[in-house]
Regions:
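Short, solvent-exposed, charged loop/turn and helix-capping segments
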Residues: 67-84
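Alpha-helical segments in soluble extracytoplasmic regions
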Residues: 50-68
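N-terminal intrinsically disordered, cationic/polar leader segments
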Residues: 1-50, 80, 85-121, 125, ...
Length: 133
């Protein structure tokens, strides 16, 4: 029977590739890189260095958001959000801090520290859910 006429089989997965490997450390490493760019630029007057640092800071900020979104949309499920009612707000605040209103718009390492703090709060909840699983 041609594949087109074969019966449809419904499958589901919690992510694009159901690997089950999640860790907020990925977001944290990228946020640490953002903070390092901010700190190093403060000590350097070379315009080429600053341009490279800006590009890296933008890219790493996007990666922070990506890793947070994967956790938010693929790992955490409705029971987690019920048990931790502030979880959606934490993700919203963290992704905004990694965006145009946060690390992308600022060279202040304190903004990166706020982002790292939100990631740490998310990580604490993440590891609690892993223990319960």
């Amino acid at each position: 029977m041609p594949r087109v006429l074969a019966p449809t089989v419904l499958i589901s997965a919690h992510c694009d590739l159901p690997c089950g490997v999640y860790d907020p450390a990925q977001a944290r490493l990228e946020a640490e890189s953002v903070k390092a760019c901010m700190t190093k630029v403060a000590d350097n007057d070379d315009p080429d260095f600053k341009a490279r640092a800006l590009a890296i800071k933008e890219e790493r900020s996007d990666l922070v958001k990506h890793h947070l979104w994967v956790l938010w949309t693929d790992y955490f499920k409705p029971p987690h959000f019920a048990k931790y009612p502030n979880l959606n707000e934490l993700f919203n605040e963290a992704t905004k801090l990694a965006g145009a209103g946060g690390t992308k718009a600022s060279w202040d390492p304190k903004v990166a520290d706020k982002l790292l703090g939100k990631i740490d709060e998310i990580a604490e909840i993440f590891w609690e859910t892993k223990k319960a699983a």
